[in-house]
Amino acid sequence: MKDFVTYLSTAPVIALAWMSFTAGLLIEINRFFPDPLVFTF
């Protein structure tokens, strides 16, 4: 179990988790607020 915890704390695993979280956050923001760069007044 100690080796598994060490594996989870390595940089590639943390980077993958962070990028997945960021991608999911961006997808959800774009789902609720589509095209925030285009505002028609």
From Swiss-Prot:
What the entry lists under InterPro entries is as follows:
PSI_PsaJ, PSI_PsaJ_sf
One Gene Ontology biological process = photosynthesis
Annotated transmembrane regions: 7-27
Tell me where it resides. Answer: Plastid, Chloroplast thylakoid membrane
**Superkingdom:** Eukaryota
Record GO cellular component, one term: chloroplast thylakoid membrane
The source organism is Tupiella akineta
Write out the similarity annotation: Belongs to the PsaJ family.
Name of the protein described by the UniProt record: Photosystem I reaction center subunit IX
What is the documented function of this protein? May help in the organization of the PsaE and PsaF subunits.
Listed A to Z, the keywords are: Chloroplast, Membrane, Photosynthesis, Photosystem I, Plastid, Thylakoid, Transmembrane, Transmembrane helix
Protein's membrane topology: Single-pass membrane protein
User: Pfam families, per this entry?
Assistant: PSI_PsaJ
Show the SUPFAM superfamilies listed in the entry.
Subunit IX of photosystem I reaction centre, PsaJ
